[in-house]
Amino acid sequence: MSKLILSYRIGLGLVVGAAAGAVIYIVFRRNRKKTRKWTSKQNGYYSQKGDELDTSNNLQAIPGEADILTGSRGEQLDLLNRLDYVLSSIVELHQEVETLRSSLHGLAEDIVGEVRTHLEENQRTLRRRRFLPHRERTDSTGSSSIYFTATSGAAHTDAESEGGYSTAYAESDFERESSRASEAEEEDEVSCETIRTMRRDSVDLVTDDDDDEATTIATDPVDEELTLLLQKSDELHSGSTEQQREGFQLLLNNKLLYGDHQEFLWRLARSYSDMCTIAEDAQEKKSFASEGKEEAEAALQKGDQNAECHKWFAILCGQLSEHEGIQKRIQTGYLFKEHIEKAISLKPGDARCYYLLGRWCYEVSNLGWLERKTASALYENPPTATVHEALQNFLKAEDLTPGFSKAARVLIAKCYKDLGNNATAAHWLKLAADLPNVTQEDRESTTTIEEMLPATAEEELLV
């Protein structure tokens, strides 16, 4: 009996639970249909879904309430479309504002840049007027210029690659007064305008055979700021290894500003030559020599009447040939000789050019069998030179600038030794030993002196 009652209660509970679940499901479905949103969007406007249409049909049983819902939903649709239009307009307006803001920012940067440039130019002008040193008139030249002059005496203390050349700067009284007058007139007539005093640059100093000095000036307009930069470059080039590195970086940083000036370009080529000498890695040496040769070529394109351009082009050709094969070295040898001779014709007082030509002659006279055969196969007229020609060029360099280079005196001793004059060779070795080591060549020559002196003395005793 108890089992029957228990079964009856369980069955009744299941029926009641099923009925309650059905009621809850029907209520949930009805509420869900009533609260469904207008979410579908076609061509930028909102519309009903299929389920919502069914809901509106079900509501037709109550006419008044259905009309209210229909009108309310129509207004909501219109309101949603208007809100969508407003939002799209706001987005477009925001994009236009961003575009305008970026344009204004770029315009502001341009204006600030122009104002800063103008102020810097004015400040440079003021500094040039106030702080440029007063330069007295000299007898060497009558123009404002940078030039090189061969020195005598203790010239071995000069720059490594210049070999006895010092930088001078002079300004004539007439030019100084003319410059002051023109600046005063421009100050009265023009306000807030950059005033640059253009100068003439001279690079060639030609000495007359009758001891009457005649200066040949190669003119190139250079402003005072560039002139000061070139003077600083010359000073650093004449200094230590670190100063030469500093000078190279100084010129490299100003290449964009002054890369069109011949005087700047050949000095940059000279700095590349310095860096080639300083560098220890073979690939770095080749890279510096190659890039320096390109700068020297660019300088020559500005005009071929500048001795320094020809000289440094030849030097860099020689430095580059050290890292090339026999055929390329022979081809470069012709180019080297051509430009060194051109430099001598333009500037016959340059002892370094005679020294370089002497080295070329000495190396050609000592070419090996393979190199001679290669030159004969490549050229109808292969390069030729004698030890005597090399000696004459070395002696010319020593005559122009006594004590020009320890390496030059050692090469003079080698020439005399090759010609069989051991006594004179020993004399020049002793003279070379008296000079200090200035360049890397000088340091290498010290070892050569130590090796040659005893051998030369023994040969002299045997004779």
Curated annotation (Swiss-Prot):
Chain ranges on the Mitochondrial intermembrane side, renumbered to this chain: 1-4
Classification via InterPro entries: RMD1-3_a_helical_rpt, TPR-like_helical_dom_sf
Membrane topology: Single-pass membrane protein
GO cellular component, one term: cytoplasm
Residue ranges that the UniProt entry lists as topological domain Cytoplasmic: 28-463
Keywords in alphabetical order: Coiled coil, Cytoplasm, Cytoskeleton, Membrane, Mitochondrion, Mitochondrion outer membrane, Nucleus, Transmembrane, Transmembrane helix
Coiled coil segments of this chain: 279-302
Subcellular localization(s) per the UniProt record: Mitochondrion outer membrane; Cytoplasm; Nucleus; Cytoplasm, Cytoskeleton, Spindle
A Pfam entry, by short name: RMD1-3
Transmembrane segments: 5-27
Short sequence motif named FFAT, residue ranges: 146-161
Biased composition regions of type Basic and acidic residues, renumbered to the chain: 173-183
Domain remark in the UniProt entry: The FFAT motif is required for interaction with MOSPD2.
Known role: Involved in cellular calcium homeostasis regulation.
Protein name: Regulator of microtubule dynamics protein 3
Gene that encodes the chain: rmdn3
